[in-house]
Amino acid sequence: MMSDYKTLTCAEVSIGDKLPALDIDITSGLVVAGAIATRDFEPVHHDKSVAQAAGLPDVFMNILTSQALMTRFATQWSGPEAVVKTL
């Protein structure tokens, strides 16, 4: 029920406010799924051997997935009517 959720106003937020934790297990599956969902077919996001050949320890998350997780965090904290304008 959406009425249970409140959107924070600027007056309710201050620089230095402590934000709640958001625990997300970052797995290879999440990294690969995020890359495929955003149509990012660069092999370093889904092929461990290619990532290692590039000097990386494993596949790594693409920027769009990172941004999506940050937007999720911000809007979960700030409320359903909040809009993320920039990160």
Question: How should each PLM-predicted stretch be described?
Answer:
Residues 2-59:
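Catalytic strand-loop segment that frames the active site of acyl-thioester-processing enzymes
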Residues 51-87:
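Hydrophobic beta-strand-centered segment that forms part of the acyl-chain substrate-binding groove
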